[in-house]
Amino acid sequence: MPKIHELSETLTNQIAAGEVIERPASVVKELVENSLDAGATRIRVDFVDAGLKQIVVQDNGTGIARDQVDLAFTRHATSKISNEHDLFKVATLGFRGEALASISAVSHVEILTATKGAIGVKATFSGGNKKGQEDAAAREGTQITVRDLFFNTPARLKYLRSPRTEIMKIVDIINRLALGYPSVSFTLSNTGKVLLRTPGNGNLKQTVANVYGRHIAEKMEEFEAKDNDFKISGLMSKPELTRSTRNFVSILLNGRYIRNFQLNTAIMDGYGAKLAARHYPIIVLAIQVDPLLVDVNVHPTKQEVRLSKEKELSRLITSTISNVFIKKTEQTSAFANLENKRETLVDQLQFNLNQNVVNTARKKTPEIHENNEKPEFLAKPKKPEEEKTDYVDLNIPREDDKYIITKTWDKNVLLQQDLRPFSNTLCDSEVISSGDETLANNLPQLSYIGQIDTYIIAENNSDLFLIDQVAARRRLQFEKIYEMLLSKKIVQQGLLTPIVLEFGNLDFIQIKDKIDQIKQIGIYLEDFGQNSFIVRSYPTWIHNDVEETIRQILDGYLNLDKGKSENLFKRVAAMQAKRDISGKINLAAAEASQILIDLRKTEDPYHDADGRLVLVRMSENELKKMFKRDK
């Protein structure tokens, strides 16, 4: 066995860097947290080549004294704790004194720093060794430049993800810190292109608007509560505004972004059954607590913590979120129309056996075209300068708001009406067609009897069928849209006024990366700057609320697993079918009969696209048992 010996400082720093510095985002996190601990109110982060080539973090904090620069790059040297007792009441984001030493061990680092009223100093480090130091002109604060990350540990480079993924991890880190410190102005840029800029005015809602987009911030509710040990506050999305992953749940404990299963569960319990299955809210939850109740020294990244009185905090979170919905319900109830009368059972019974079908003629529409080539309906609006708007102000309209479609969009949209292809003549009660023999479907031929409320009553031999007309119409609409998407023959309709869609920086990056795939469903997006896209036309299978529909489609696409285009087509068709068929309508006998015919032609006549039952069958034997005539 070789002799035991002490490792060199350079080697120990490289080993420590393996735990602290996993990827470029780790460097950004450590440096920005140092800036926040130094009291900075303005922080700028620039990176090149996903952070591997260069990362620059500049702040206006207190700076580092010239005689302490060397000490700052020494392992376990810190100004944030002094003894073992301080470890149990950590009030800063960093405290171990490992970051700068670990970063300099695997890169080339240059630091330019100055304290108030003092001459600045510039020092350089490479591979954990100091290369030089000199006086330099500098403002109060610190600027650290990291170049050629992992230059001396090439094996680490093989385990990094794609440049796009590494960029998104950097963006996510800054987003979380910006949400945790709305009083600090953050600027993040990639090779000179600004990805995020926040005002630093302490307005959390405005910060959310810059991080996630104004359309999301406007749909979020404020909350605040406290007990003897905890104070919580933040913003939460309404139940209809969700995501299919937990990535938009930000829990900030004394400004530190943490991951905690029990607190996540408390948030979900607060929403209860208001959320759809496997959907999660967008929420920024800020928790203020005495540092004595928190142990942050349990994980290298400090994202996992140990909390005293965690159950009490969970109850506070759940009850606070629930109370937001209770208050909203009370406000809504106050304006409810109390004079609405319940329909009588007689009014609900609709046996339309001999009703005629109204012949509705199609309206003429402007000339339309297929999506073989991208249309040019209008001249492009002038693109805004990249640096024109510093940040999103919810109280000041954007200059390009004139391009945004508002609730009166229908005045500017030339719609092609899409009517149901029902026959003009009265259909016979027996649902039988000469072409139906080719249907190898196990749904039998049904004879229409009548309707009660939202249900169609039909029979086959001695069996009785109840068909939910809403679910049935959704199934038919789903099949129609899905077949259109598969055929790639999607008709476009031009917009008289283009729509500008704003997104958060992460969403913008993901959508831009998938623009070509999104074109397959007939949605053409153009980069319009400031994390926004412009839309000049839309597919005619979108019948109303064009802007909101496109937003929902893109939101769903962000969380779509990689796979075949059919997966996207099915999701889009199912979502649009649900939007098109929102409730029951009064069906003529011929229309109801046509639904029964068309159901037999579908892939699954028994369920709609969301898996809900379309029909229920009651056999003659079951009916006899119900009436005790089985003997």
From Swiss-Prot:
Pfam families to which the protein is assigned, alphabetical: DNA_mis_repair, HATPase_c_3, MutL_C
The organism's place on the tree of life at top rank: Bacteria
PROSITE patterns: DNA_MISMATCH_REPAIR_1
UniProt keyword terms in alphabetical order: DNA damage, DNA repair
InterPro entries named in the record: DNA_mismatch_repair_CS, DNA_mismatch_repair_MutL, DNA_mismatch_S5_2-like, HATPase_C_sf, MutL/Mlh/PMS, MutL/Mlh/Pms-like, MutL_C, MutL_C_dimsub
CDD domains: HATPase_MutL-MLH-PMS-like, MutL_Trans
Disulfide bonds: none
GO CC terms of this entry: mismatch repair complex
Single GO MF descriptor: ATP-dependent DNA damage sensor activity
A GO BP entry: mismatch repair
Record has DNA damage as a keyword: yes
HAMAP family membership: DNA_mis_repair
Functional summary from the UniProt entry: This protein is involved in the repair of mismatches in DNA. It is required for dam-dependent methyl-directed DNA mismatch repair. May act as a 'molecular matchmaker', a protein that promotes the formation of a stable complex between two or more DNA-binding proteins in an ATP-dependent manner without itself being part of a final effector complex.
Protein family (similarity comment): Belongs to the DNA mismatch repair MutL/HexB family.
Protein name: DNA mismatch repair protein MutL
